[in-house]
Amino acid sequence: MGDVVHTMPAVSDIARHRPDARIDWMVESAFASLPAMHPSVQRVVPIAWRKWRRNLLKEQTRVTIGRVRSDLRAEPYDLVLDLQGLLKSALFSSQAKGLRAGYDWASAREPLASVWYQQVATVDKSLHAVTRSRMLAAAHLGYTVQGEPNFALKMPDPSWMPPSPKPYVVLIPGASRPEKLWPEERWVAVAKAVAARGLEIVWMWGSKDEASRCVKLAAQSDGEIPPFLSVEHAAAVIARARACVGLDTGFSHIAAAFGVPTVGIYCDHEPGLVGITGKAFVASVGGRGKSPESTQVIRLLDDALSSAMRRSTW
């Protein structure tokens, strides 16, 4: 999910510099609602690779993949741009009809992906993911990256909101891998700090394990736990928050993309290349072997809340 969010500014750049361009976006089906929130995306092409790879020998899977391939090849594109630089993204982009473009061998996250491209560009691998995507698009479409990243997301309508009318802070304690998790007692300390500041808490989750973790944390502190929400409806709740504190997960990046003051907590890798990025206050804290203390996160949360109050008075 984070990769999808990080690509949004590149799409905004393309639309700005090539206003006559029609932009279609191929994406994992679970995240298809995210590109649909960008006003410059005309069509979203969903693929279910996570599901297909477990059932490649089944006839239905092959039939479904064949339909997607036929759909892609029915549309002649001037440029098929792979902004991920992975083998799987290169493979699927090669199914579309058009000039295939991407990173060169030295720049791609998976160098072998560059073999599939007909046109390549060099982009420094030490840059943030958002900047890399913007620079790759600029290199292949002949313009220069200018200004701050513009995520340009349309705010979706919510299907659920916390019952209290008070402003709320979204806490996101779940992650895709155990190594990313932050100690529970530190989450409880942050939650109590939020409550002490007169704000509501919404514990956001996306899987059964994450829901269980939220229930456990809320029992030790306070807060509302929403029912299961689609990515679109979760984004609607996150986008309306006063601030957000979350792990290195897609929901945290969504918060920052919507301009919510956001503190990102990193526990298993350095945040430099994938740190929290957005137009409002953002902070990325921690790193591999450097799990931050709750006091540090609470200080940053106070900075985030202060920035939110300043923005509300503009």
Listing of model-derived features with the role each one plays in the protein:
Residues 1-314:
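Catalytic machinery of carbohydrate-active enzymes
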